[in-house]
Curated annotation (Swiss-Prot):
One of its GO terms (molecular function) is DNA binding. One of its GO terms (cellular component) is cytoplasmic side of plasma membrane. This is Bifunctional protein PutA. Residues 164-501 are annotated as: Proline dehydrogenase. It catalyses: L-proline + a quinone = (S)-1-pyrroline-5-carboxylate + a quinol + H(+); L-glutamate 5-semialdehyde + NAD(+) + H2O = L-glutamate + NADH + 2 H(+). Its cofactor is FAD.
């Protein structure tokens, strides 16, 4: 037995695993427990009590309706949509122009180079029908913006030269790029000024006009996701803002201006409780003390749902701090769309009483609605933290109004642009009013027209504070897009109030009565799927854990500790029972003092034991439905035991808690997906026979389970060889599968090192499934090439290997989003994913002098440690050997003079195998000799004009697994994705975490043979005759095939003509499906031509069949010149001839994308060995005898001649999900 690199002498006694996994920040009170319990409560449970609590007397309802009607009539009467109201009315998100406007608003002034800026303008404007909007609004602002877009659209669109006007337009277009650029810039800045008060906090003079009318202000230095340096700078900005805001002293908290701060802008890791309380709390206290000194208000702004309770922890500490006593200026924003809203308000009022102060409570409808929906669906959580209907939020807004106005401990600040809500609050609060009792709030640039009817004598005489963003257009355009999204939605009040088709009666309807009249009070929106039913009736989505829930964390921590106390073992499991062997311990790679369990490895003399079992051991057997049911039962068992499995994965594989959860979920998804696919598509297919499954250590349960599940449900017996490093979780997976009904004869486990795998591959099995390195896959291919399956064909090999995965980022991309996606893609799982980002390609205009600065700053805040603590970001690499190989590469790069940036490692990492997140600047892509499997990101810069050359360089690596692109240019997306040769494409998002059935996973070239795991073709590779892929309107017959069939018909080759036509009707070339998935994404699955196919025919008829199969799938061919069949293809149609070449030297003429062989067993074996020896990608070889070709029209499976491509597009990248916002 080879030495185990994980085994080292014990140092000190290891601490008890998970003893400090997620200690509570503060003990939970009864009120805090109520908040936690309501986090994801079903809407049908939330709404009935809210409806009752919000129900008002008929007198108040009638008075509110009358006031709301007067407000709306006044608004509609004095103007028709001036400012932003008119803009969002004219350009709704249901129009192409509205979406283009949103995209334009976000990016142009941020783009540093004029070429990309001009390209964005052309991309977004040229196709819009801007002229149709001209003059439809009476607003000067709307028409000014429209005129600019009309002119720009004319200058950028394609023109017809036959008219004089077209020639003039073309002349202006050729000469006028600066004019176009300046016009769009002006239009976007004009829009920005509608929302942004000023560029600096000192620019407060714009506020004076409305202050004189009785308005007050709360200023917010809006900031994006920060690095540590950004957070420090933002803190200084907030300090300066407080000083500047307080200059006009003496007006007090309620009548003077205030400041809003965003906690996530002040700390780069505002989700990790321990760090936040230790590092952020002192900063916030310092700002609060400064605000207290000036006697102004300081509001803590809203965050995403998973940060709420952490924000409440900070608020509680601040309010109970003696240094801040006597100051009533602390404020907190509560979002009514959250199901916890009523309980948060109860907690804040109680906190005010306990601390002896008044706390300002800004009640808003909510700011992250679409993102919360998507997050819950992605994470497989029990329910949403927010309501799915906007009218439910309107109801949630009301119940605490009267109580809040009566309770002197709180100062309600009602932030709304809805006239009905405003009127209801006005009458519910009563006529007894004094300054400081309550106030209204609105957003700068949006609510002033409404509140001009509220503020001052002769109006409703209630105060309104304007929430006013401050900053440059460059920093605040994301905020602008968000406002356009929220208010451009057809369901928003701002949009509807300016729509003459919406009656005033509709606008003033009491939401409480509307909800009460619904068939089911609190029924969720029927167009928003709960996470569990994301895939409809086909299958249940796997469930995750909500790690922002204190109760969940507490129960998970207990389960992890119980898991650590279990005795984990792995034994060889044959059909006849467990086998003996040499036993060794398995150590935690993050802490070698922690003994996870023990494994008994398969002895050499028992390698042959499974062979006997193969002969008498059947597959899973039974009907398809029974086999699928076994997988479903296994999925349920795995789901129920997830906490226990997590503890084992974390300790054995060194995964973080989040990664371990994703691992188990993926395994469950594989089980359910293959069960569903079996029922739907497999039919009465014949299994291949015994399958050897060799799985990797980096996904020791998910890939292990996926391989086995697919092979078993197709009816094949399985010999499972887990990775040497992770046998324990594999053994537990086998126990679960057997408990679910898989017989021992159908599933055997053989733990051990590479020699066990080699012995299994050398056996007489019918197929091999392998995930691992390209080098090992080549060895397996060469070993299999020397023999044939019982049917006389090449032994099927499904290999999924590594990748030199790249991401291209152009200057139109949003830097903050890019940094987050890059860090996740490169360093999640310590870079030990085959999909991980290895090379970041930055356009030089955006990269600056040091392109890795932003990523480097962010990387410094990744915590590397043993992941038995929840806050760990980056765990260990798997073995000492892996660590040594990575460090050698880093040193080689240093030796070449490349710039290397690394974060330091904490001293406690010395007990494990850790490599710090590392960023290396390269001069060219060819500096990389091979894939570096660890937390190492390489960065190169490129010129915009060299984009095509860069894509060619990426393709030239020969790998083709994952690829990422960050750009706002649709034209660039279409161009790059059409040229890149990769199996999984990711647009404006990270490039990891493919979801089963949503982003089928697998590469091409050096990255694998296909078919894609978790995709519709996978099971077909495990039976003798694959089912025909789903037909779709996108599928088309290649016209070149039709030309070939016509040519064959002219030769009188009737059988071959029929074969060609049959191939055309069976081919799925061009298939383009949108797969089900979470909101905010489009997930496309397409089938393309595979490339150039090597044909090795023995007869003329065989050649015609091979060529027909290749052409039916859109491919070109290289025909073996040694076949001597050149005369058989004389006088081919030109279209066909362009696809055909002859090859005398396969090595020189390659690489090829596949091979079709004709011949007897001896010839097939000889050709197969020759192909296995070729350099380049792993080729999928299909072979058949001449007799079989004549008898069987499906002798060559067309599925293996097409290339599967999965593309995942973040449709919310521009700031939000337009389609989802429109339905709320």
């Amino acid at each position: 037995m080879s030495p185990n690199p994980l085994q080292k002498p014990a140092i000190d006694a290891a601490p008890a695993p998970f003893a400090d996994f997620a200690p509570p920040v503060r003990p939970q009170s009864t009120l805090r427990r109520a908040i936690t319990a309501a986090y994801r409560r079903p809407e049908t449970e939330c709404l009935p009590p809210l409806v009752e609590a919000a129900t008002q007397s008929k007198e108040i309802r009638d008075a509110a309706a009358s006031t709301a009607r007067k407000l709306i009539e006044a608004l509609r009467g004095k103007h028709s949509g001036s400012g932003v109201e008119g803009l969002v009315q004219e350009y709704s998100l249901s129009s192409q122009e509205g979406v283009a406007l949103m995209c334009l608003a976000e990016r142009p002034v941020r783009i540093p180079d004029t070429a990309t800026r001009d390209a964005l303008i052309r991309d977004k404007i040229a196709d819009g029908n801007w002229k149709s909007h001209l003059g439809r609004s009476r607003s000067l602002f709307v028409n000014a913006a429209t005129w600019g877009l009309v002119v720009t659209g004319k200058l950028t669109s394609t023109v017809n030269d036959r008219t004089l006007a077209a020639r003039v337009t073309r002349l202006i277009s050729r000469c006028g790029e600066p004019v176009i650029r300046r016009g769009v810039d002006m239009a976007m800045r004009m829009m920005g000024e509608q929302f942004v008060t000023g560029e600096t906090i000192e620019a407060l003079k714009r506020s004076k006009e409305l202050e004189e009318k009785g308005f007050s202000y709360s200023y917010d230095m809006l900031r994006e996701r920060p690095t540590a340096a950004d957070a420090e700078r933002y803190y200084r900005d907030y300090e300066s803002a407080i000083h500047a805001t307080a200059k006009p002293r003496g007006r007090g908290i309620y009548e003077g201006p205030g400041i809003s701060i965003k906690l996530s802008a002040l700390h780069p890791r505002y989700r990790q409780a321990a760090r936040v309380m230790g590092e952020l709390l002192p900063r916030v206290k310092a700002l609060a003390l400064l605000a207290k000194n000036y006697d102004i208000g300081l509001n803590i702004d809203a965050e995403e749902a998973d940060r709420l309770e952490l924000s409440l922890d900070l608020l509680e500490v601040l309010c109970l701090d003696g240094d801040l006593s006597g100051w009533n200026g602390m404020g907190f924003v509560v979002q009514a769309y959250g199901k916890r809203c009523p309980f948060v308000l109860d907690f804040i009022i109680d906190l005010a009483r306990r601390s002896g102060r008044r706390i300002m409570v800004r009640l808003v409808k909510g700011a992250y609605w679409d993102a919360e929906i998507k997050r819950a669906q992605l994470d497989g959580l029990a329910d949403f933290p927010v309501f799915t209907r906007k009218i439910h939020t309107d109801v949630s807004y009301m119940p605490r109004t009267q109580a809040a106005c009566r309770d002197r401990c709180g100062v309600p600040q009602f932030a709304t642009h809805n006239a009905q809500t405003l009127a209801a609050i006005y009458h519910m609060a009563g006529k007894d009013f004094h300054v400081g009792k309550y106030e209204f709030q609105c957003l700068h640039g949006m609510g002033e027209p409404l509140y001009e009817e509220v503020v001052g004598r002769g109006k409703l005489d209630r105060p309104c504070r304007i929430y006013a963003p401050v900053g440059t257009h460059e920093t605040l355009l994301a905020y602008l897009v968000r406002r356009l999204l929220e208010n451009g939605a057809n369901s928003s009040f701002v949009h509807r109030i300016n729509d003459p088709k919406v009656s005033i009666d509709e606008l003033i309807a009491d939401p409480v009565e509307v909800v009460r009249a619904m068939p089911v009070v609190g029924a969720k929106h029927d167009r928003i799927a709960l996470p569990a039913v994301l895939f409809g009736d086909a299958r249940t989505n796997s469930a995750g854990f909500d790690l922002s829930n204190e109760e969940t964390l507490a129960s998970l921590t207990e389960a992890l500790r119980e898991s650590a106390a279990m005795k984990w073992t792995a034994l060889p499991q044959f059909a006849t029972g467990p086998a003996a062997g040499e036993t060794r311990t398995v150590l935690n790679p993050g802490d070698h003092r922690d003994v996870v369990g023990s494994v008994t490895e398969t002895r050499k003399r028992t390698h042959g034991a499974p062979c006997a079992c193969r002969r008498r051991g059947a597959g899973l057997g039974g009907r398809l439905a029974e086999r699928a049911a076994c997988l479903d039962r296994a999925a349920e068992l795995m789901q129920a035991r997830m906490p226990t499995l997590l503890g084992l994965i974390i300790r054995e594989a060194g995964k973080s808690a989040l990664n371990a959860i994703a691992e188990v979920r993926e395994a469950i998804d594989f089980l359910r997906y293959y069960a569903e696919q079996t029922r739907r598509t497999l039919g009465p297919a014949t299994p291949l026979g015994p399958i050897v499954c060799i799985s990797p250590w980096n996904f020791p349960l998910a890939i292990f389970t996926g391989q086995i599940a697919a092979a078993l449900v197709a009816g094949n017996p399985v010999l499972a060889k887990p990775a040497e490093e992770t046998p324990l979780i594999a053994a537990e997976g086998v126990r679960i599968l057997r408990e679910a009904g898989i017989p021992a004869s159908a599933l055997q486990l053989l733990p051990g090192d590479g020699r066990v795998g080699a012995a299994l591959v050398a056996g007489r099995d019918a197929g091999v499934m392998f995930t691992g390195s390209t080098e090992v896959a080549r060895l397996i291919q060469a070993q299999l090439a020397d023999r044939l399956s019982p049917a006389g064909r090449p032994v099927p090999l499904i290999a999924e290997t590594g990748g030199q995965n790249a991401m291209i980022v152009d200057s139109s991309a949003l830097a903050g989003q890019v940094v987050g996606d890059v860090i996740t893609s490169a360093f999640d799982s310590a870079g030990q994913r085959c999909s991980a980002l290895r090379v970041l390609c930055l356009q030089e205009d955006v990269a600056g002098p040091h392109p890795d600065d932003a990523e480097g700053r962010a990387a410094r805040h990744c915590i590397s440690a043993a992941p038995i603590v929840f806050s760990v970001d980056v765990g260990p690499v798997i073995t000492s050997e892996a660590k040594d190989n990575i460090e050698k590469h880093i040193e080689r790069m240093r030796g070449l003079g490349r710039k290397v940036e690394q974060i330091g490692l904490a001293s406690e990492t010395g007990v494990g195998t850790f490599v710090p997140p590392t960023i290396i600047e390269l001069e060219k892509l060819s500096d990389l000799q091979r894939e570096v499997f660890g937390p190492v990101l390489h960065v190169i810069r490129y010129r915009r004009d060299d984009l095509d050359r860069l894509v060619d360089d990426v393709n030239a690596t020969g790998y083709g697994l994952t690829f990422g692109l960050h750009t706002r240019l649709d034209e660039t997306i279409a161009h790059v994705t059409s040229r890149i040769k990769a199996g999984n494409l990711y647009i404006n998002r990270n490039i990891i975490g493919a979801v089963v059935g949503v982003q089928p996973f697998g590469g091409r070239g050096l990255s694998g043979t296909g078919p894609k795991a978790g995709g519709p073709l996978y099971l077909g590779r495990l039976v003798t005759t694959a089912p025909v892929p789903p037909q779709h309107s996108s599928v088309h017959t290649d016209p070149v095939l039709l030309d070939f069939a016509k040519w064959l018909d002219g030769k009188g080759a009737r059988a071959e003509v029929e074969a060609a036509r049959n191939a055309g009707s069976s081919s799925a070339l061009g298939l383009d499906l949108e797969l089900p998935g979470p909101v905010g994404e489009r997930n496309l699955y397409t089938l393309h031509a595979r490339g150039r196919i090597l044909l090795v025919p023995a007869t003329e008829s065989g050649l015609y069949h091979q060529l027909a199969a290749a052409l039916a799938t859109g491919n070109s061919v290289a025909i073996d010149a040694a076949s001597g069949l050149q005369a058989s293809l004389k006088n081919l149609p030109q279209t066909v001839g362009l696809r055909v070449s002859w090859s005398k030297d396969w090595a020189a003429d390659g690489p090829f994308a596949g091979a079709l062989v004709e011949g007897d067993a001896e010839r097939i074996r000889a050709v197969n060995k020759a192909i296995a020896a070729l350099p380049g990608p792993l080729l999928l070889v299909q072979a058949a005898s001449s007799g079989e070709i004549a008898r069987n029209p499906d002798a060559y499976c067309l599925n293996w001649l097409v290339e599967e491509v999965s593309a995942s597009i973040n449709t919310a990248a521009a700031g939000g999900n337009a389609s989802l916002m429109a339905i709320g």
